[in-house]
Design a protein with these regions (language model features):
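Glycine-rich phosphate/diphosphate-binding loop of Rossmann-like nucleotide-binding domains
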Residues: 3-108, 257, 288
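N-terminal charge/polar-biased segments
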Residues: 168-169, 250-299
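N-terminal Rossmann-like NAD(P) cofactor-binding subdomain of oxidoreductases
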Residues: 70, 85-91, 109-114, 120, ...
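Adenosine-phosphate binding glycine-rich loop
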Residues: 12-16, 131, 135-262, 284-285
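Generic recognition of stable, solvent-exposed alpha-helical segments in well-folded globular domains
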Residues: 4, 32, 36, 101, ...
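Rossmann-fold NAD(P) dinucleotide-binding segment
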Residues: 93-103, 111-133
Length: 299
């Protein structure tokens, strides 16, 4: 989940034109999904040259008790949440957090239906030229907002992705195709690379690398339609390319135990893949030509 979400964020930056380290993220929810996404985002920001402490300052989380801050009177800041507790006065409501923090991206992963209200979406649109809105909770009934709400309220400005499938939305003559952050984009490629080159430790760096590989597969045509993920119809190619990229990464970082290292990684991967589709064995049929519905026999 974290890798898919971060891939979507990285692809979104191709639309917003804002460097990753200059973004501010607010999470609706501070459970395992949000913590995982935030952790990978911090790693990605550190790779751009800023310190881990500065990266964490750009990640804000809101749980059922409000903004996660140090010494919160209502408590509940324990475990992994402590890492993302900010030096800030307590704030109870998500909308007030967004007004104070002015994030460039909001990410929902707590299954709180309707959490991204019209006021929140309007605020995001007012504060950003291209606000990032990721409503990742599923099923659809638990989504923080629908694609239609996001595009309509932000007047087509937002970069939207969801955890549940939503139909295309037309606003002001332009049709947007919401991207779905489906885990199926990531785990087949990771599993394939892990098995084929015998990766014995799947580190957080492996997940971040898979996110970067996936983000790089989103072409300009997809971005122009609002998509931050490649079409699911290309899942075989996506999985193959992620596996190849991760195999290169694994050998470079001494994570692979399959030797000798394959010279042609693509040929190596494809040699272990199977095409499960069946060719038809039915005889070909043709329409009978007009005018030949009767046969004459002359002696």
């Amino acid at each position: 989940t974290a890798a898919v979400a971060v891939a979507g964020i990285l692809a979104s930056l191709k639309i917003t034109k804002k460097p990753l380290k200059d973004n501010v993220f607010v999470f609706q929810g501070a459970g395992e999904a949000s913590i995982g996404i935030a952790t990978l985002l911090v790693m990605a920001m550190v790779e751009t040259g800023i310190s881990e402490a500065d990266a964490i300052k750009r990640v804000w989380m809101v749980d059922s008790r409000g903004l996660i801050v140090k010494n919160r009177p209502s408590g509940g800041v324990t475990g992994h949440k402590m890492r993302f507790a900010q030096d800030h006065a307590p704030v109870d409501k998500l909308v007030d957090v967004i007004k104070k923090v002015k994030p460039t991206a909001i990410i929902g992963a707590a299954a709180v239906a309707g959490a991204f209200t019209e006021e929140i979406l309007t605020t995001m649109a007012n504060n950003n030229e291209r606000p990032i809105v990721f409503a990742l909770s599923n099923p659809t009934s638990k989504a923080e907002c629908t694609a239609e709400q996001a595009y309509n309220v932000t007047k087509g400005k937002c970069v939207f992705a969801s955890g549940s499938p939503f139909p295309a939305v037309t606003y002001n003559g332009k049709t947007f195709h919401p991207g779905q952050g489906n885990n199926a984009y990531i785990f087949p490629g990771i599993a394939l690379a892990t098995i084929l080159c015998d990766i014995r430790s799947i580190t957080e760096e492996v997940f971040l690398e898979s996110a970067k590989l996936l983000a790089n597969m989103v072409d300009d045509k997809s971005l122009s339609m609002g998509l931050v993920y490649p079409p699911l119809s290309r899942i075989l190619q996506v999985s193959t390319d992620i596996a190849i990229g991760l195999i290169n990464f694994a050998y470079k970082h001494k994570l692979a135990y399959h030797y000798p290292e394959p010279e042609d990684k693509r040929k190596f991967v494809e040699s272990y893949q199977y095409d499960m589709s069946y060719k038809t064995f039915e005889p070909a049929t043709y329409d009978w030509p007009d005018g030949l519905n009767s046969t004459e026999c002359k002696v």
